[in-house]
A protein has these predicted regions:
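Hydrophobic alpha-helical transmembrane segments
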Residues: 41, 45, 60-68, 94-96, ...
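Membrane-embedded helix boundary and interhelical linker motif in transport proteins
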Residues: 9, 31-76, 80, 85, ...
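Single transmembrane alpha-helix segments in multi-pass membrane proteins
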Residues: 3-52, 78-92, 205, 215, ...
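Helix-loop-helix "hairpin" substructures at the membrane interface of multi-pass membrane proteins
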Residues: 14, 149, 157-158, 165-243, ...
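Transmembrane helix-bundle core of multi-pass membrane transporters
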Residues: 84-85, 93-190, 286-320, 336, ...
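Hydrophobic alpha-helical transmembrane segments of polytopic membrane proteins
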Residues: 20, 70-72, 252-277, 323-333, ...
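Inter-helical junctions in multi-pass inner-membrane proteins, predominant
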Residues: 2-17, 184-192, 218-264, 281-292, ...
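Alpha-helical transmembrane segments within multi-pass membrane transporters and channels
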Residues: 58-100, 107, 271-276, 280, ...
Length: 344
């Protein structure tokens, strides 16, 4: 039972990190119609900027300052570069953001090097947020923080206690992602600037006639989307690894989340992030194969069948391709995504 609970929480935390990153891309696409190919590069940039700040004044100032720096850089890119090609359609926008992704990668390698940097979370996030205890006598219980010393090292037998800690970094990741979801929802539905942003999407001429600067609103949207990616980078970089390959590792999965959830749908991105995070985490955690399934059904595979390399593939080995399989199935059976309204 504790394996299921911890795996589920790990999947939810990974899914919420995906949402924190994909929410910025979804916001940019829904408001501007721009599919930012360099979005994961802002994620990487947030991690590296926070790493540099944390070395001088600590992690918590870096958590606040790095997303702001990345957001300003994103807004400047929209103002100086993206706005100039916007009138020519989607292909020039894709090409210029594609070029930006490689430019950011090369700059990161020039400034911080080609190997991973040691970006650690603060001391208060290094231990477990809580520990699940499972004993034959008391069943499943929960202890905040680490388990009492010596409890998990009890002798084998009836007194043995299984301890499954859940890292505080992942709990913090979940908290920040849910907080950002609430802030985005309140901003877009309960504030004046949110109403202006949504109106600028559907009736830009009317909004401009009312005295609002539509290009500045769109620049703000792009900057906020990049800042969300930077915030995800601070948390993801300190929790996992901060290296030049982190954008390439997570970027394709983020595009899968946006398409599966529905282009431009924040609710769809949230649902798709959780689904992909949980499915991929359980696939990595479960040690199973088609051959094992055949044997579990009581069938006796012959020597030729037992030696088949395809049947011997573990579920954990195919876990990295599951999001893309999900994407293909979604495009075949529901092209507009889970909660999307656009077919293409």
């Amino acid at each position: 039972m504790e394996f299921f609970v911890i795996s589920l929480l790990n999947g939810l935390s990974y899914g919420l990190l995906l949402f924190l990153l994909s929410s910025g891309l979804t916001l940019i696409f829904s408001m501007m119609g721009v599919l930012n190919f360099a979005h994961a590069s802002f994620y990487m940039l947030g991690a590296y900027v926070a790493y540099s700040i944390a070395r001088w004044i600590g992690f918590w100032p870096g958590l606040v300052i790095a997303p702001l720096v990345v957001g300003v850089l994103g807004a400047l890119f929209e103002r100086i570069c993206l706005r100039r090609v916007h009138r020519y359609g989607n292909v020039p926008e894709l090409l210029i953001t594609f070029g930006l992704a490689y430019l950011v990668l090369e700059l990161v390698q020039l400034v911080w090097g080609r190997i991973a940097v040691e970006f650690k979370p603060p001391a208060m996030l290094l231990g477990p947020a809580f520990t699940l205890l499972h004993s034959p006598a008391d069943g499943l219980s929960l202890v905040l923080g680490a388990a009492p010393a010596g409890l998990c090292d009890a002798a084998a037998g009836a007194a043995r206690v299984l301890c499954s800690p859940f890292p505080a970094t992942r709990a913090f990741m979940m908290f920040v992602a849910v907080l950002m979801l609430a802030v985005l929802w309140l901003l877009l539905t309960r504030t004046r600037i949110g109403l202006v942003i949504q109106s600028a999407l559907t009736h830009p001429q009317m909004v401009e006639a009312l005295g609002h600067d539509v290009p500045r609103v769109l620049m703000l949207v792009f900057g906020v989307g990049c800042a969300l990616a930077g915030l995800a980078g601070v948390i993801g970089g300190s929790t996992f690894v901060t290296e030049p390959a982190m954008a390439a590792a997570l970027g394709p999965v983020v595009f899968v989340v946006v398409v599966v959830g529905g282009m431009g749908s924040l609710a769809g991105a949230f649902l798709a992030s959780l689904l992909i995070g949980v499915i991929q985490t359980f696939a990595v955690a479960v040690d199973a194969s088609l051959l094992g399934l055949v044997e579990a059904l009581g069938l006796a595979p012959g020597p030729q069948l037992a030696g088949n390399s395809l049947l011997q593939l573990k579920l954990s080995q195919v876990a990295p391709i599951l999001p893309y399989l999900f994407l293909v199935l979604m495009l075949i059976f529901r092209p507009k995504g889970l909660l999307g309204t656009r077919e293409g």
